[in-house]
């Protein structure tokens, strides 16, 4: 399965649930033509969040699909899929999107839907990755960009960055340093995928030709 590398900037749809700091990193990067990608739209699962406000200030189209507005999760998943599809993305980026997508979304965007995680997967998956790494006593942790699949933080790894753990670290301090690394890693990974394309073979993701 190969994607990308065509002429013209890659089209991104970015999904958010909160403040949108990873989105802002992508918006800032996309202001440079050499980045090779543009944010075509920003979607959210709730209204009134800073992530949507960031997009609106940048003149980016936005949409909201709230789970509570649909009779079941499958209906929400189809609606989210249709909304994202309407912007013809080359790559879909979860930038702090806190909902698990379903079969319709993965069928449409499998192999081109990426997410970040604040640990070195497959170690410490789930919502408490930073705390779990600190509690375990590891000397290094970090962040991962990965392809989303039907599991929780189980998709193929695309890129990782290491963050040392300090003796005096607490969860909040360590998480802040991981977030800095995560933003840089996400921007670098999207840039590489947009410019060089990517392919997925089983659990192996190759970026560039």
PLM region spans:
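Donor/substrate-binding cores of folate-linked one-carbon enzymes
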Residues: 29, 95-204, 208
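Residue-level detector of anion-binding/catalytic polar loops
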Residues: 61, 90, 139
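Short, well-structured alpha-helical segments in soluble
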Residues: 78-87
